[in-house]
Amino acid sequence: MKNSKAILQVPGTMKIISAEIPVPKEDEVLIKVEYVGICGSDVHGFESGPFIPPKDPNQEIGLGHECAGTVVAVGSRVRKFKPGDRVNIEPGVPCGHCRYCLEGKYNICPDVDFMATQPNYRGALTHYLCHPESFTYKLPDNMDTMEGALVEPAAVGMHAAMLADVKPGKKIIILGAGCIGLMTLQACKCLGATEIAVVDVLEKRLAMAEQLGATVVINGAKEDTIARCQQFTEDMGADIVFETAGSAVTVKQAPYLVMRGGKIMIVGTVPGDSAINFLKINREVTIQTVFRYANRYPVTIEAISSGRFDVKSMVTHIYDYRDVQQAFEESVNNKRDIIKGVIKISD
């Protein structure tokens, strides 16, 4: 077996270099990686470097954290897995003993070791990687490893929908129909919502939202978003508004779209300061931020396996590992056409 990994040489340039095959610790599994999804955070890292720059200027930077593959070796204390098992991973490994971890909120652990970011900047764009057994999940027989890799962004949408307490009968507005917006749409449908409006400015994304079950799609570049959403909610406002675009524009719109006593869920990463009209939310409106996920992989895997959550239809571009530079360049320059890109590492 030979190994290599793709690293960020400088912003805008990926390079594939040789690497040692890691040896699993007693509680780890060694995984042959097959697919890695390209996340928006990876694209940002490719363009500008990590959100949080490493303290060491010579730190090697890996990208990629949405991955799945096949177990090829296990540590001495591993009991749940054996070579040949197809698996995916939660890319964040928390400390396990802080207040947040003990409360089950390990996604906000201050010492979490999350792939492709601090402290180790270890990416998933490699042939082989080791991961703790406790954050590794076996895939059902009817799920392939491409779907397995996309459990990670799907879990973000599922976490957002479950935090928001989505239920049948609630009207939902989703601002943004990128990958996370579409994952949130499907999570809401899995939880019983049937009246869901999705807003975006790109027709291809809106067509995908309609294909995946949106009740109403609104092109914010051509229509008055607030007026159309008021029409959708019969001037009542939505029970829940999900901001998934990470845009100051959509954050500003959200208070005008939510009902009295409703919820605004900030799922996207919004840069800098954002103006919010607090007079519009001075009606017992809850604003909740969403950060990654905690304890959502099992329910997300089940939803995909059952056919209720379709991640594969969202994949518009598949790249070979050797074309990793092209994959990231197109992810930067072809955002209008790419809904979800994945990189095939190995068969």
UniProtKB/Swiss-Prot annotation:
Cofactor binding notes: Binds 2 Zn(2+) ions per subunit.
InterPro entries recorded: ADH-like_C (IPR013149), ADH-like_N (IPR013154), ADH_Zn_CS (IPR002328), GroES-like_sf (IPR011032), NAD(P)-bd_dom_sf (IPR036291), PKS_ER (IPR020843), SDH-like (IPR045306)
Alphabetical list of Pfam families matching this protein: ADH_N, ADH_zinc_N
List of residues binding Zn(2+) 2: 95, 98, 101, 109
Transmembrane annotation, as ranges: none
Superkingdom, natural source: Bacteria
Name under which the protein is recorded: Uncharacterized zinc-type alcohol dehydrogenase-like protein YdjJ
Taxonomic lineage from the root: Bacteria, Pseudomonadati, Pseudomonadota, Gammaproteobacteria, Enterobacterales
Gene: ydjJ
